[in-house]
Amino acid sequence: MLVELSIKQFAIIEQLTVSFDKGLTVLTGETGAGKSIIIDAIGLLLGGRGSAEYVRYGEKRAEIEGLFILEPKHPAFAKAEALGIQADDGMIVLRRDVTNQGKSICRINGKLVTLGILREIGQSLVDIHGQHEHQTLLHKEQHLSLLDHFAGPPLETVLDEYKELYKQYLALERQLAQLTENEKEMAQKTDLFQYQLKEIEAANLEPGEDKRLEAERLKLANAEKLFKSVHDAYNNLYGEGRGLEWINNALTHIEDASSYDPELGKLQQHVQEQYYLLEEAMFTLRDYLDKLEFDPTRLEMIESRLHELQKLKRKYGDSVDAIVEYASTIEEQLDSILHKDDRIKQLEQSLETMRLDLEVESAALTNIRKQIAMELTESIHEQLRALYMEKTSFEVKFHETAEGKKPFRENGVDDVEFYLSTNPGEPVKPLAKVASGGEISRIMLALKTIFSNHQGVTSVIFDEVDTGVSGRVAQAIAEKIRHISVGSQVLCISHLPQVAAMADTHLYISKKEVGGRVTTEVRALKDEEKVEEIARMIAGVEMTELTKEHAKELLDLATSIKCNH
């Protein structure tokens, strides 16, 4: 949900920070105080169209920032993570600056992003009713997803099975496409792979050969230095006045001393062990010198072989092992190409089998969806009746293709769209085309009542959805908005006292003059202040004790409704 909103130098707002809570927050105030400006700022934060006109006169830029706290599994986190944006502690911070030149600077959790990315993340967080671009319920491409969410568990298992099968189907299609690409390219690949294999096989490579030869070359190329170093080491150990003789003399003296002090026996043993180790090392050095030889012919052969291997490395890999692995890969591909007709036949048979399975699975999906569509239709009609729109018709249409056979897609074959008719005798039309005129607010409210828990958004904003209604319709609208706020945070600008009475938090928007300029202020109303404001909404300028009593009655009614639901 939206926890905090900060607005600076936006329209008439100089600086404003508003904290929001869960449930229903209603914003009221006199005309022109800045209620819709706050909603405009949120719309801009969610990726709406920006303009230099939004920047307060005389300022360089407008700044809007919103802090959202979400459930760990909210889809916004997956989207942010895919874009390399860190989202710590379940928080997402959106920020947008608009300069007086009309340029936008967008950030998510401090990272610069494009306006498109800001819009994509923003629309998964908030749905604004009142700004057409945020009315996700009007978007046809959302209707199948909404229907599936409404269906819940009965559909999920079948849909998951279909998706897994569809993924395998696409993989087989890609393999078949690779095999059936144009003959000229296949012939070129065949010639290339055959040439490469012939060249690699002619080299008679052995795994790890390059590493072994490089080690041997190092030894042969430095044979003279190697001989001198080993010979000097040997001479330092063996011979008169050399290392072993000195240690042997020391051992004799320690042995004599230990006859007077037994404690030296351990030292004698230790020195004797070291003597034997050095003696063994001396013999090893002697044997090494006896075997050491310099073979110029062998060195030349190694250099030649390493040069040959280096040429292959430049073409096929950075080591002999990598070249061998590459050869194995192209050998498989070559075999596949040379036997492609058999492989194509095999893939086509597998695809046909899988296609039949997909038809069965997609048909099962369609049947479930059509059953759920009837339940959804009845639920929507129930909501419309509660809003005194019993003559409005709602339908979920499953579009058919001209050929009758629908293509497989990630979520099945169904092309679903919501249709509506607001007048008896008139045919239903696509929801987006009917969405105009005074009744649309109630229609959208009915839809949102059903789908508020299925859209994924955490916050729903209603910007004066109650214009032009009163009486029982106004009370019905208030109750629907309250119902939506149970599952989603709702922010609502309203002129209806019935809606204001339902508020969990009532914010009053006012404007004042500071330094010769007007700015907007927001404050949360306390109990008595709520009565005063609702009475003002009922009566206008002239408030009486009667209007205050009416306001209290509305608040009592709202409390009763909340307690019973």
Swiss-Prot record:
Keyword Nucleus: no
Keywords (A to Z) from UniProt: ATP-binding, DNA damage, DNA repair, Nucleotide-binding
Listed InterPro entries: DNA_recomb/repair_RecN (IPR004604), P-loop_NTPase (IPR027417), RecF/RecN/SMC_N (IPR003395)
Cellular component GO terms, alphabetical: bacterial nucleoid
Entry binding sites for ATP: 29-36
Covalent S-S links between cysteines: none
One GO BP: DNA recombination
A GO term for molecular function: ATP binding
Recorded family membership: Belongs to the RecN family.
Protein function: May be involved in recombinational repair of damaged DNA.
Name the UniProt record assigns to this protein: DNA repair protein RecN
Source organism of this protein record: Halalkalibacterium halodurans (strain ATCC BAA-125 / DSM 18197 / FERM 7344 / JCM 9153 / C-125) (Bacillus halodurans)
Name of the gene this protein is made from: recN
